[in-house]
């Protein structure tokens, strides 16, 4: 995880930045699934936590070899005109680290009740007692909107940037490039 590549969204009057970032992130996810492995992480250096926005830059963190392999894939077809690429570069030192991870909200009590009813053979009334409407939790985190390849449903993938740390701990990344224990340099 000693190299990185910045991909910046170009201003576009037809597409808002959040929409372009969602498309870019979805294409990256597909490329990471095809490439396999758990050694590529992402961060959003232009993050604006006060407004829950990821910003207009996606940073991909990897070794030089993993970054070269990713860039050799044709995963950005149809999107290149909307993007500006930096050159792969070495991570500056010293730099702090942080986890960039997915957060799943338990925001839909109705869905949770249906799941509980299916799994435990409960009536709707019993499920409502166990999961009242008050359990709904809205997240105030930035997100990308993706489309599930298996169901076709659109969903929000909420992203949390954890606190800064002096050192990185060992861990990997998901096929979204998000932490499953791994840390990325933050600069």
Curated annotation (Swiss-Prot):
Note accompanying the cofactor annotation: Metal-ion independent.
Gene3D superfamilies: CRISPR-associated endoribonuclease Cas6/Csy4
Gene: cas6f
Comment field (misc): In this bacteria, Y.pestis-subtype CRISPRs do not confer resistance to phage DMS3 or MP22, but instead are required for DMS3-dependent inhibition of biofilm formation and possibly motility.
UniProt-recorded name of the protein: CRISPR-associated endonuclease Cas6/Csy4
NCBIfam families: cas_Csy4 (TIGR02563)
Impact noted for substituting residue 148 to A: Cleaves pre-crRNA 8300-fold slower
Biological function: CRISPR (clustered regularly interspaced short palindromic repeat) is an adaptive immune system that provides protection against mobile genetic elements (viruses, transposable elements and conjugative plasmids). CRISPR clusters contain sequences complementary to antecedent mobile elements and target invading nucleic acids. CRISPR clusters are transcribed and processed into CRISPR RNA (crRNA). Processes pre-crRNA into individual crRNA units. Absolutely required for crRNA production or stability.
UniProt-listed Enzyme Commission number(s): 3.1.-.-
Marked site: Substrate binding: 148
InterPro entries from the UniProt entry: CRISPR-assoc_prot_Csy4 (IPR013396), CRISPR-Cas6/Csy4_sf (IPR042564)
Keyword Repressor: no
A GO MF term: endonuclease activity
Keywords for the protein's UniProt record, in alphabetical order: Antiviral defense, Endonuclease, Hydrolase, Nuclease, RNA-binding
Effect ascribed to mutating residue 151 to A: Cleaves pre-crRNA 380-fold slower
Subunit structure: Part of the Csy ribonucleoprotein complex with a probable stoichiometry of Csy1(1),Csy2(1),Csy3(6),Cas6/Csy4(1)-crRNA(1). A Csy3(6),Cas6/Csy4(1)-crRNA(1) subcomplex is also formed.
Family of this protein: Belongs to the CRISPR-associated endoribonuclease Cas6 family. Cas6f/Csy4, subtype I-F/Ypest subfamily.
Residues of the active site: 29
Gene Ontology process terms (BP): defense response to virus; maintenance of CRISPR repeat elements
Gene knockout outcome: Infection with phage DMS3 inhibits biofilm formation; disrupting this gene restores biofilm formation despite DMS3 infection. Normal biofilm formation in the absence of phage infection. Loss of production of crRNA in the presence or absence of phage. Disruption of the entire Y.pestis-subtype CRISPR region disrupts crRNA production but does not alter phage resistance (possibly OLNs PA14_33350 to PA14_33310, plus the flanking CRISPR loci), indicating this CRISPR is not involved in phage resistance.
């Amino acid at each position: 995880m000693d190299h990185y590549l910045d991909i910046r969204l170009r201003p576009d009057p037809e597409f808002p930045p959040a929409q372009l970032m969602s498309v870019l992130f979805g294409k990256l996810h597909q490329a990471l699934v095809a490439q396999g492995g758990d050694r590529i992480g992402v961060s959003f250096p232009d993050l604006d936590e006060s407004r829950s926005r990821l910003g207009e830059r996606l940073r991909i963190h990897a070794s030089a070899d993993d970054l070269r392999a990713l860039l050799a894939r044709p995963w950005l077809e149809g999107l290149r005109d909307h993007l500006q690429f930096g050159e792969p570069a070495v991570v500056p030192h010293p730099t702090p680290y942080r986890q960039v991870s997915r957060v799943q909200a338990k925001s839909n009590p109705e869905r949770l009740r249906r799941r509980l009813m299916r799994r435990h053979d409960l009536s709707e009334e019993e499920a409502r007692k166990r999961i009242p409407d008050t359990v709904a939790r809205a997240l105030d985190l930035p997100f990308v909107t993706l489309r599930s390849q298996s169901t076709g449903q659109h969903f929000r993938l909420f992203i949390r940037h954890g606190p800064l740390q002096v050192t990185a701990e060992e861990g990997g990344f998901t096929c979204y490039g998000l932490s499953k224990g791994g840390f990325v340099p933050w600069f």
